[in-house]
Amino acid sequence: MVTVYSRHGCHLCENAVNTLESLREELEFTIDVIYIDGNPELEKLYGNEVPVIHINGEHHDFYKVDPERFRTSLEKHRRHQ
């Protein structure tokens, strides 16, 4: 499970989700996009760092998705399940 913490109207967030969508079929994972707008707790945690990407609930990266780095991280998470 990949979670993207996002904001409405965030072009970096849209780019990150598009990159993940392009990898989803090949790597077989689900994507959950959570908008932090209006959620004080999430806004405090992630604020201006969006998009923030988590893999299986653990922080992976923010601002952008590097496909090779994401692949490597996803594989590590799968080995440790």
Q: Where do the protein language model's features map onto the residues?
A:
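Structural micro-motif
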Residues: 47-53
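Thiol-based oxidoreductase modules, predominantly thioredoxin-like and allied folds used
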Residues: 29-40
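N-terminal beta-loop-helix "entrance" segment that forms/cooperates
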Residues: 40-47
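Short helix-capping segments at alpha-helix termini
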Residues: 24-28
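Non-catalytic, surface beta->alpha helical segment in thiol-disulfide oxidoreductase systems
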Residues: 55-81
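Local sequence-structure signature of Cys/Sec-based thiol-disulfide redox active-site neighborhoods
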Residues: 1-22
